[in-house]
Design a protein with these regions (language model features):
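Short beta-strand/turn micro-motifs at beta-sheet edges
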Residues: 60-65
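Mid-chain, well-packed structural core segment of small domains
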Residues: 73-90, 96-100
């Protein structure tokens, strides 16, 4: 069986979150999307389940973190180019997200990120394997 990853994130407003991520170019699997959750397709075998906070709470006995006040997780996605990193951040900002940090350029690796409408941090990274420094 092929492994899949489902990142589950608590959200406040389903339609607003779906509109935000649609503006970034993501699609949703209607088979696993309803008023309680939306299955966002990131790539083959990689998904984010955007879950209404009340529904998310049914999966844990711990309090649900307020992602606008504390960091619960950093979701990191690879990109095919520096331009793709910048374009996705641009789309996130245009859709109402924020960029909590400046881009970081390490020569062999370039990264930038955004916070979505619920405060979840999404890091985007492009790496140039040919430029990775050799191990000492």
């Amino acid at each position: 069986m092929t492994r899949q990853i489902f990142v589950n994130l608590a959200i406040e407003n389903m339609e607003r979150s779906k509109a935000f991520f649609s503006a970034l170019g993501f699609s949703f699997n209607p088979q696993f999307t309803n008023d309680k959750g939306a299955c966002m397709v990131i790539a083959d075998n990689i998904y984010a389940m955007l879950l209404a906070e009340s529904f998310f709470q049914t999966f844990t006995k711990k309090p649900v973190a307020d992602a606008t006040k504390s960091t619960e997780v950093l979701v990191c996605l690879s990109c095919d180019s520096r331009a793709e990193v910048d374009e996705m951040v641009r789309k996130a900002l245009a859709a109402g997200g924020t960029a909590p940090n400046a881009p970081q350029d390490h020569g062999f690796m370039y990264s930038h990120g955004f916070e979505d409408l619920d405060g979840h941090v999404w890091e985007l990274v492009w790496m140039d394997p040919a430029a990775v420094p050799p191990q000492a």
